[in-house]
Design a protein with these regions (language model features):
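Absolute protein N-terminus
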Residues: 1-2, 92
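A broad, low-specificity signal marking well-ordered, structured residues that form hydrophobic/aromatic
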Residues: 2, 20, 72
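Short, extreme N-terminal segment that most often corresponds to the first beta-strand
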Residues: 2-14
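Ser/Thr- (and often Asn-) enriched beta-sheet segments in non-cytosolic proteins
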Residues: 6-8, 26, 53
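Intrinsic-disorder/low-complexity regions
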Residues: 14, 22, 83-84
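Long, compositionally biased charged/polar stretches
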Residues: 18-26
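Eukaryote-biased intrinsically disordered, low-complexity acidic regions enriched in Ser/Thr/Pro
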Residues: 28, 32-65, 71
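Short, compact, well-ordered microdomains
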Residues: 54-92
């Protein structure tokens, strides 16, 4: 199983609470752990649903999404408070 363990936001957006501002996601449990651009992660989970989970309880799946401006991004199931667990990961 692969896990998203931390995120990098776009320059100037370190404190953003927008999934669209995520630039890269650190993935572990794969042959080459490291940071991957969000569009690469988007394509992977689109082709392989359920293959990456957020490393925050309750470990929701990372799923693909497309913004109204046709920008590829990823998200997870919101937690009980309506907050996406992907945004709870440590930031660099």
């Amino acid at each position: 199983m692969m896990f998203a363990t931390k995120i990098k936001m776009k320059p100037g957006c370190h404190n953003s609470h927008s999934l669209l501002e995520i630039d890269e996601i650190y993935i572990t449990g794969c042959a080459t752990p490291g940071y991957y651009k969000k569009d690469i992660v988007h394509d992977h989970v689109k082709e392989n649903p359920g293959s990456i989970q957020v490393n925050v309880w309750p470990y929701p799946d990372v799923v693909h999404a497309v913004s109204v401006n046709r920008e590829k991004y990823v998200r997870s199931s919101p937690n009980a408070y309506g907050h996406d667990n992907l945004l709870s990961l440590p930031r660099e």
